[in-house]
């Protein structure tokens, strides 16, 4: 999961570009030689961002083991996300970490408190939950979910974080138009 997370910011800042999936795979390959799941994760996140949500039509963009792993998540969408994540594998290995994050996101996507419920389900599943939480958070943000204000109130150095994000966005667009 971590190799894709290295590329997530690039994808989110440039989702409108058709070549962003391949660029994300190139970035991910800096940490791993296998980019099959990075491509899957990038495709799912990009579709979520471009459509403001996610449905099973994303399966048409996937192939092989990655499609099968994603299909299984949709098939089990109604099941308890904590137990399902444990069954997929609650460590950092793929496809389990991808499946656990995606499952929690899909399971809670209609909830008014989807941000909190999704991330709390990811955390309650235990194991190495940081990668799952990062990917679930990216899916939530891409779908328009908002970090609850009472969570932001407890955040240290929020202004520094916002400034860093703005600088990164500005840097990412410097080379465009060449």
List PLM regions with ranges.
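Amphipathic alpha-helical interface segments
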Residues: 1-109, 118-125, 139
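Conserved glycine-rich phosphate/nucleotide-binding loop
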Residues: 142-178
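Phosphate-handling active-site elements
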Residues: 16-20, 110-114, 143-155
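Short, small-residue alpha-helix embedded
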Residues: 133-144
